[in-house]
Amino acid sequence: MTLKVGDTREAVVIEKVARTHITKYAGASGDFNPLHHDDTIAQGLGGYPSVFAHGMLSMGLTGRMLTDWLGPVALKRYGVRFTKQVWPGDTLTAKGEVTAISDGVATIKVVTTNQNGESVVEGEAQAAV
């Protein structure tokens, strides 16, 4: 794969997160924290307007943009922080930008935003080039 500093990739990784997506992720991950599937708990105990997606679901969706772009073998490291909750109905767009290349490894800044342009995931990946 040929990459150069400044190369970018942007993709909508999910249109309208559904409660079904969140519930399926809970089953796949084994994370049944009620904040993610029970409005009564999310609102009453958590003080949130509704349930919200697992951070790792958002990370996984963002990671799909990276592997679609770079290929699953090239991706060597990937880490993020969750900057805002992802709510049912949100549409997520992930963007990667090559910020450096050294010794055959590209460093890629990653940001995923919701439909309002608010960052929900920020991080960095490294890929073999």
Language model region names:
Residues L66-A94:
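Mid-chain, well-packed structural core segment of small domains
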Residues M1-L70, A74:
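Hot-dog-fold acyl-thioester-processing enzymes
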Residues D38, G46, V51, V80, ...:
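Hydrophobic alpha-helical context, especially transmembrane and signal-peptide helices
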Residues M1-A11, Q85-V129:
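HotDog/MaoC-like acyl-thioester-processing domains
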Residues I41-G47, F82, A125-V129:
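Short C-terminal domain-edge/linker segments immediately following a structured domain
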Residues V13, H21, A74-Y78, L92, ...:
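A generic structural signal for short beta-strands and their flanking turns/coil linkers
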Residues N33-L35, K76-R77, F82-T83, T99, ...:
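Short, intrinsically disordered/low-complexity patches at protein termini
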